[in-house]
Amino acid sequence: VKFLAITLIVHAPDPVTGVRKPTNARFREVIDNALLAEELGFDGFGVGERHERPFISSSPPVVLSHIAALTSRIRLFTAVTTLSLLDPVRAYEDYATLDHLSGGRLELIIGKGNGAAQRELFQVTPEDQWERNAESYEVFRQIWRQDKVTAATRFRPELSEAEVWPRPFQQPVRVWHGSATSKESVDLAARYGDPLFSANVTNPIEPYAELIRHYRERWEYYGHDPARIAVGAGSAGYYAARTSQEAVAAYRPVFEGQLAFQKALGLEPVFPTLEDYVERSSALIGSPQQVIEKVHRYHERFGHTVQHLQADASGLTGAQHRASLELFQSEIAPVLRREIPDPPFAWGPVFAEAVPEASPAPVTSPVPATSLAPVTSAAPAAVTPEQEPEPRPDPAPPSASSSLPAPADR
């Protein structure tokens, strides 16, 4: 099993102290948490994308590019890229550039996004956001795979033999589909043979387990090999200490502060008490053995091979946050890595034959994903660095005075 640390870059008062950090300090905290994740041995670090208060994660490629410059090993995730709000051409340009700068460490989790305010900002309606997401993804994946793209699109100007640069480093980038509440995202992932990442944050696990069950069903319907399924799952919170009593006592003021924040926004808490939160939510709070057992319970329901933890302290002190993550890597992760399998692909840059995959359908007037023809081509397998094909060059090579560093060893 692989472990990610993920942040949505919430910019709100600390749930315990009530102090809100300056914006630049909050960004600095995100960078520090990414460096800590690499130092401690996490397999990936993810940055969300939201375009409304209280989030300041409106530009994940910029944040991830900065992290890429300061790290060398950890894989870099978006969590999620809101393709329903974005021009897929510009999204491709940003992420292909980031993929080169990071030496092929980029992985995308895509989704339609949440929130009425950001839909209004981008003039997207609840009725068309699924079609926008599906169309943007189809165009995005074609650009990543094909040197020239023609697409009769509905939500952006049509493309005719369009060339988009730079050409990609990974061939192709791995794309996960974020899933929280709807079968549309699940079906889109299954249709293309892409991995699924279940949010598993807001509610008890039952609705998430049902969506994952539906994903597996649709995966087989579309003719993909069941052995190639990959599922990731989130957690609502994390704090481990030597004893469960110590963990619960330390986390109680954090939970109570978060509860007060929810009530101030007029939200009805899903978990009204800390005890209920520890028992029924996806939060991993307790002793190392309790955390191990809870992840196993999730694995029995989800069959997931990637688990994410919250990257932020979120009310814990800096010392508590670091000690808890160190405990995770020293006593929890080694056990889970032995007992839960890895995803069915190599954890590294993806390279395949430079032949475009067959597309399931041209992008014309989008229709619901469930009515589209199945795609039976399997996801391209990763190969070892020794087998890596030479990336296709840009039309003109950079000058000798270029200051860009060479890609990291792959």
What name fits each language-model region?
Residues F3-A5, F45-V47, L76-A79, L106-I110, ...:
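Hydrophobic faces of well-ordered beta-strands that scaffold small-molecule active sites
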Residues F3, A37, G41, E49, ...:
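Conserved, mostly hydrophobic/aromatic
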Residues G44-I67, T82, N114, N200-N203, ...:
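Glycine-rich, proline-tolerant flexible connector loops at the mouths of alpha/beta enzymes
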Residues V1-T71, R75, Q171-V173, A346-A352, ...:
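N-terminal beta1-alpha1-beta2 module of alpha/beta enzyme domains
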Residues P13-F27, T81-V89, Q171-T181, E279-P288:
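Active-site mouth loops of central-metabolism enzymes
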